[in-house]
A protein has these predicted regions:
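Metal-dependent nuclease catalytic core centered on acidic motifs
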Residues: 1-52, 57-62, 83-161
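Conserved catalytic cores of phosphodiester-cleaving nucleases, focusing on short active-site segments
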Residues: 71-84
Length: 161
């Protein structure tokens, strides 16, 4: 980033989604994180890159299924969601983003609010909703929710004890 000196690295082997809009959102978020002074690395995914896997499931037949987070933010893994609309409620959308990040054993649930759908209260209430439905939330991987606004401003939210 010319603004902060932080960098966004795109490692060879990083699989962008088949949806062009989602791939563009991943790149926009990586640049926005760097513009906010945090180094970010989009890590590779797939069978050749299992060392970057954040979760491994062993199937009944002994085969392994690897899951990969989006990348590293500083030294934390994150998984990104870019909602284009709110289906049931903003709070539920936040809870689902946290579940998605936990499924991949990421430490940060990152929400790219490209379409200005969320307010601070939505994020806080979504985190509380997640905590109320998952009693063992402290032992899960996600430690924070980071929101990148449509203006590329980074907001960090932590769980209440």
């Amino acid at each position: 980033s010319e603004q902060t000196g932080a960098h966004a690295i795109f490692m060879k082997g990083h699989n962008h989604t088949d949806k062009i809009a989602d791939a563009e959102a991943e790149l926009e978020v990586a640049r926005a994180i760097a513009d906010n002074g945090i180094n970010v690395t989009l890590t590779p995914e797939g069978d050749k890159y299992t060392m970057y896997a954040t979760n491994v499931k062993i199937n009944k037949d002994g085969s392994k299924k690897y899951k990969f987070a989006e990348g590293l933010m500083a030294t934390y893994t994150y998984e990104q969601k870019t909602p284009t609309e709110i289906n049931s409620s903003a709070e539920s959308s936040v809870r689902l983003a946290i579940n998605h990040a936990n499924d991949k054993h990421a430490q940060i649930a990152l929400i790219y609010d490209k379409h200005s759908l969320f307010h601070t209260k939505d994020i806080e209430n979504g985190m509380k909703l997640y905590q109320s439905r998952h009693k063992a939330w402290k032992t899960k991987g996600v430690k924070a929710v980071v929101v990148i606004s449509s203006k590329k401003i980074l907001y960090e939210h932590h769980f209440d004890e």
